[in-house]
Amino acid sequence: MAHLILIRHGQSLWNAANKFTGWVDVPLSERGRAEATIASCKLRDYRVNVCFTSMLMRAIETAVITLTECDDICGGKIPIIKHEADDENWHGWDNYDGDPAAELPIYPTATLDERYYGDLQGLDKAETTAKYGKEQVQIWRRSYSVRPPGGESLEDTRKRVYPYFTNRILGHIKQGDNVLVAAHGNSLRSIIMILETLSEEEVPKVELATGVPIVYELDKAAHMLSKAVLTN
């Protein structure tokens, strides 16, 4: 038995400003950092062994705060950002002669990045709705296969998330590790679609609050045994 903990990043500055963010690398707001701190307290009874995040700072910030505000989560280990050997952004600079057993690895990967919103990125959501109409914007935001102009659909996001999740992340689950994934609304919807076998009609309706952990209990075959949403 293992636990998979999913957490959407805390509120970002552009969440607060009601802008489409996508791949724009915006940091957490003060509220977002507080949400991650609260999440850490909620997870104090879970011992995390490994963490995966997107490459975007709002997800990495959320992961680091969640893992460091409550020492019980790490079991005395030090969270260290690591890179896969085949990561094109890795230059070997984080190599050192240390004890891996004293580390809690955090693996950033672009496969967990938010859905790319294309031409909508940086636009105010209310102004975009006024320009294109509520129905059209809702289709761009919450349909499964329709892409916003120049961007990705949820289906596109799932296609890039699926191989990494099933091979890399579930590999740790099958070893009995407790895994934290700090990512984004649509990359997490893609994971939830797999875990809960949701249909293409069901998954766009999944709502994820910022900074709220979702804890799945999984067996060694990665089948879901239980789910808990750790709200206030």
Swiss-Prot record:
SUPFAM superfamilies attached to this UniProt entry: Phosphoglycerate mutase-like
Pathway linked to the protein: Carbohydrate degradation; glycolysis; pyruvate from D-glyceraldehyde 3-phosphate: step 3/5
Top-level division of the source organism's lineage: Bacteria
SMART domains to which the protein is assigned, alphabetical: PGAM
GO MF term list: phosphoglycerate mutase activity
One of the GO biological process terms: glycolytic process
Residues annotated as binding substrate: 8-15, 21-22, 58, 114-117, 125, 141-142, 185-186
Keywords from the named record: Gluconeogenesis, Glycolysis, Isomerase
Any Pfam family: His_Phos_1
Top enzyme category: isomerase
Active site: 9 (tele-phosphohistidine intermediate), 114 (proton donor/acceptor)
Catalytic reactions on record: (2R)-2-phosphoglycerate = (2R)-3-phosphoglycerate
UniProt-annotated site: Transition state stabilizer, residues: 184
Record EC number: 5.4.2.11
Matches recorded under InterPro entries: His_Pase_superF_clade-1, His_PPase_superfam, PG/BPGM_mutase_AS, Phosphogly_mut1
Function: Catalyzes the interconversion of 2-phosphoglycerate and 3-phosphoglycerate.
HAMAP family according to UniProt: PGAM_GpmA (MF_01039)
Family named by the database record: Belongs to the phosphoglycerate mutase family. BPG-dependent PGAM subfamily.
Record-given protein name: 2,3-bisphosphoglycerate-dependent phosphoglycerate mutase 1
Lineage, uppermost ranks: Bacteria, Bacillati, Cyanobacteriota, Cyanophyceae, Gloeobacterales
